[in-house]
């Protein structure tokens, strides 16, 4: 299975991309539009687009950290790849990137987007709020750079950027996104609703649902 997403994501759905391809075929949606209001790592959306199943993807995430990542790799591709190449993969850098997340509301998008990426690749299970692989003392069986294959990750990002004109990106609440899109979508469109885990969401994601939602 080809991996297109540069992110590791709790609850990632890359393994069921083939199911969605079959769903497009069964419902005569080939060449249509795929919409994901909670994009996260975007594995399914990227697979459908890059393999020519969908002609357009509309991706959205209310979490500004994730929006910043997607915005940055689409609009600052070269700068982002330079950051991957030039940023030391160290505990000191990990602390610096974590500080950026603490001020995510005001952070510049490229800086925030790279911070999201760096922490995703260096934290256990890709959880932004989680602990670093190998621990702060780097005494674990796997160390901070265990999931940080720079060359492969840059290739994925550059491939995604080639499809920029077919990717529509939003930073909205999912309900607001649906209201904004519903009157303008072509008939051959498919929504995929995969909201954050409910019970464990608080520990896994920056944005999540609670009882009031």
Role assignments for model-derived ranges:
Residues 2-23, 29, 74-192, 196-203:
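SAM-dependent nucleic-acid methyltransferase catalytic core
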Residues 45-48, 69, 180-181, 201-205:
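A short acidic (Asp/Glu
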Residues 30-92:
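Conserved S-adenosyl-L-methionine
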Residues 206-213:
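Glycine-rich S-adenosyl-L-methionine
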């Amino acid at each position: 299975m080809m991996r297109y997403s540069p992110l590791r994501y709790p609850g990632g759905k890359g393994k069921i991309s083939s199911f969605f391809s079959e769903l497009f075929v069964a419902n005569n949606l080939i060449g249509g539009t795929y919409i994901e209001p909670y994009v996260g790592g975007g594995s399914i959306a990227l697979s459908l687009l890059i393999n020519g199943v969908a002609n357009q993807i509309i991706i959205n995430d209310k979490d500004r950290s994730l929006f910043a990542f997607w915005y940055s790799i689409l609009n600052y591709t070269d700068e982002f790849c330079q950051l991957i190449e030039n940023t030391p993969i160290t505990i000191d850098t990990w602390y610096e990137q974590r500080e950026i997340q603490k001020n995510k509301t005001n952070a510049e998008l490229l800086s925030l987007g790279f911070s999201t990426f760096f922490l995703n690749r260096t934290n256990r299970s890709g959880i932004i709020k989680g602990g670093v692989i190998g621990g702060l003392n780097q005494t674990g069986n796997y160390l901070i750079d265990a999931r940080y294959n720079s060359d492969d990750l840059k290739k994925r990002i550059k491939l995604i950027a080639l499809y920029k004109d077919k990717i529509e990106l939003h930073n909205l609440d999912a309900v607001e996104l649906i209201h904004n899109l519903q009157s303008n979508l072509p008939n051959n469109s498919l929504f995929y609703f995969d909201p954050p885990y409910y019970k464990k969401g608080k520990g896994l994601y920056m944005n999540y649902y609670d009882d009031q939602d």
